[in-house]
Amino acid sequence: MMKPLMAIALCGLAASGWAQATSPVLHGAEPASVAVNDDDWRVEIVPPFALPSREPGYHGGAVVERPRAVLLFMGEGWAGARVSEVHSAFIADMPGLGSLTRYGVRAHPSVHVQRGTIWTPENGFAHHGGLTDLEIQAQLERIPSGPSAKDTVYVLFLPESHSAFLGEKVGGADFLAYHNQFGSRHGGQLRYVVVPYRHDAGQLAQAAVRSFVQAVVNPDGTGWY
């Protein structure tokens, strides 16, 4: 009896490993542009170094055709002037529509960016110096679903007191931003970008825009990358 059970177990492990290895999510992507969250899901990151230049390829997945960016500044420490500085830099760094239409983006006349707001975590929220991706998703569940939710990408800027964790990777040291999505209780996919804190507003916005564009052209991990 032991041998059949062992064979079944080995087959199960092999099947699981095969499924992970052949998952269409970010399959064939540059390894340095991928991290794994605490739910064993691969996500696309902006690494803290330049990647080899290569033309993105299309993998058959969805694109956010009429994207809207909603900037959220989490927690304390975000003065109004600082928020305005990052907001302005984000708009200035956004690629023109001409460079996005080739990927199927149809925003007109440009990508809409909603004025940044300060966002306070729920009462009793505790952290351990950083946030995992699943903890961030739990906080984002509190956002009411708007009429353009399917086209909305929330861009979450973390405070200096919070880091972000993707498995063993730490925000700032191992990645400058990342994007992901999850099935919201409000229905549909809630798409978001997470941007760990940086003192330079220009560099902060630049990393945010890079990840936002990735979230638009590659929301499911099967689009352009």
Annotate each predicted stretch with a short phrase:
Residues H127-F157:
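Long, well-ordered early-domain segments
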Residues M1-P4:
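Positively charged n-region of N-terminal signal peptides that target proteins for export
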Residues S145-P219:
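Active-site-proximal segment of zinc-dependent metalloprotease catalytic domains
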Residues M6-A15:
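Bacterial N-terminal signal peptides
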Residues G17-A19:
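Sec/Tat signal peptide C-region and signal peptidase I cleavage site
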Residues H87-P95, Q139-P147, F212, V216:
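Hydrophobic, Leu/Ile/Phe/Ala-enriched alpha-helical segments that form helix-helix packing faces
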Residues T22-A138:
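N-terminal carbohydrate-binding/catalytic regions of secreted carbohydrate-active enzymes
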Residues G221-Y225:
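Post-HEXXH active-site segment of zinc metalloproteases
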